């Protein structure tokens, strides 16, 4: 999935770039960005154009990446965090485990990806891969511990994402989770930890969320279930 779309990005500033990067990197097992995305280059070739003015399609475009890093320009550290999260969580390596959850405002979107030990074992046996799905060849650097209710010590890995789709202002909503899709009962409580900030919260089926795109365009949560 590609994150770069000039028509969307040329009016949203850095928050729009972060929002698009979260969606592309968390929704799909593979993702890519156009050169210059890290620097939030967003000048269109012409008003409403899908092409960038500073595209390599039209010119040789050298960029001083080191200077940008020194000056704190762009979103390269944010993209590094997204790739770190992708590498750490096996659930993000799969495509068909994507599930959406209800949000009572259209400006926010919520989705999850979950994989259980049984699914990984079955997929690995059928695809000739140790960790399944045919496209997984390396064990992730971080694996979720066995969760309450998992059988035979098998681990599960769940990533829950909430994104503000509006790059211009803070939005708030109630997120209603489909608990069985997360491997839990409807009335179960649990702890979510934001992989971007380290913040933790107690959650259940219905949860209030407020996201300001200027400071926090998204939550990327991992889930810790209460011990049985």
Region spans (language model):
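Carbohydrate-interacting/catalytic domains
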Residues: 3, 9-12, 17-18, 33, ...
């Amino acid at each position: 999935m590609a994150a770069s779309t000039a028509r969307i990005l040329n009016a949203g500033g850095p928050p729009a770039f972060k929002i698009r990067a979260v969606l592309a990197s968390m929704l799909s097992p593979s993702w890519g960005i156009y050169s210059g995305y890290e620097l939030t280059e967003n000048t269109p070739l012409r008003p409403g154009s899908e092409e960038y003015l500073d595209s390599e399609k039209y010119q040789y475009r050298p960029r001083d990446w080191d200077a940008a890093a020194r000056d704190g320009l762009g979103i390269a550290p944010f993209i590094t965090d997204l790739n770190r999260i992708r590498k750490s969580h096996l659930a993000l390596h799969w495509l068909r485990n994507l599930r959406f959850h209800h949000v009572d405002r259209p400006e926010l979107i919520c989705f999850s990806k979950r994989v259980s030990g049984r699914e990984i074992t079955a997929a690995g046996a059928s695809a000739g891969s140790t960790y399944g799905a045919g496209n997984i060849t390396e064990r992730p650097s971080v694996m979720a511990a066995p969760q309450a209710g998992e059988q035979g010590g098998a681990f599960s890995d769940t990533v829950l994402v909430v994104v503000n789709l509006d790059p211009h202002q803070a939005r708030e909503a109630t997120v209603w989770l489909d608990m069985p899709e997360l491997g839990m009962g409807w009335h179960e409580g649990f702890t979510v930890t934001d992989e971007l900030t380290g913040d933790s919260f107690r959650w259940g089926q219905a949860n209030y969320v407020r996201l300001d795109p200027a400071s926090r365009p998204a939550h990327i949560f991992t889930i810790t279930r209460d011990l049985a």
